[in-house]
């Protein structure tokens, strides 16, 4: 079913909206949640919470890009669940690793999470990413937004682990340099 029709079902408050959303986007949303949580049960719960979040948000919200709207809800719910579990016990995984890698670009003594949620910084980084070549931008987003593992990215793009890691490292350095030039970070050199 087309996204416009699914959104129409939400506006009509028909429960089939959730069924259609699950049929079309369930696997996609589960992958996002699982990349963050690394747990089947928690991932399924995040996806179900996403459906509830969409139900509560539409209407009045009318998403332009439904998949992006849903992925944002799933990511937010999954990261909150991950944070609460992390405070309960120290864990490791792609989310921890991705945050460690990107932490050098975040400008403050505050936690990475607080800084990433800062709208102004997010907009600056988003604008910067739009200027990158498509492959570089997509790889960066797959790693640091969707938390794909480096090996998954290698498979998807047909690159070696070394090439992918180097590309990510160079992109992080470009962002760091950009943020320094914009005055967001003190120059570290």
Residue ranges of predicted features:
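Short, leucine-enriched amphipathic alpha-helices that occur as contiguous helical runs
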Residues: 3, 26, 71, 118, ...
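Sigma70-family region 2
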Residues: 11-12, 48-66, 85-86
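Short, charged helix-capping/linker segments at alpha-helix termini
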Residues: 11-20, 30-49, 161, 184-187
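Amphipathic alpha-helical segment used for protein-protein interaction
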Residues: 12-15, 107-141, 148, 155, ...
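Residue-level preference for hydrophobic side chains embedded in well-ordered alpha helices
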Residues: 21, 25, 29, 50, ...
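Short helix-capping/turn signature of helix-turn-helix
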Residues: 24-26, 36, 141-148
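DNA-recognition helix of helix-turn-helix
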Residues: 65, 79, 125-126, 136, ...
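Arg/Lys-rich amphipathic alpha helix in sigma70-family domain 2
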Residues: 75-94
């Amino acid at each position: 079913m087309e996204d416009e029709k699914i959104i129409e079902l939400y506006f009509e408050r028909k429960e089939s909206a959730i069924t259609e959303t699950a049929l079309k986007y369930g696997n996609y949303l589960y992958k996002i949640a699982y990349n963050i949580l690394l747990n089947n049960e928690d991932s399924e719960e995040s996806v179900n919470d996403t459906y509830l979040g969409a139900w509560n948000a539409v209407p009045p919200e009318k998403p332009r890009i439904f998949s992006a709207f849903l992925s944002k809800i799933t990511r937010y719910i999954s990261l909150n669940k991950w944070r609460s579990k992390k405070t309960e016990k120290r864990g490791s995984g792609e989310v921890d690793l991705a945050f460690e890698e990107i932490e050098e670009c975040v400008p403050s003594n505050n936690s990475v999470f607080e800084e990433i949620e800062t709208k102004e910084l997010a907009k600056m980084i988003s604008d910067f990413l739009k200027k990158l070549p498509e492959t570089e931008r997509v790889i960066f987003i797959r790693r640091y937004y969707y938390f794909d593992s480096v090996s998954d990215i290698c498979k998807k793009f047909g690159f070696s682990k070394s090439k992918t890691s180097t590309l990510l490292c160079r992109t992080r350095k470009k962002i760091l340099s950009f943020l320094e030039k914009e005055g967001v970070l003190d120059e570290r050199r």
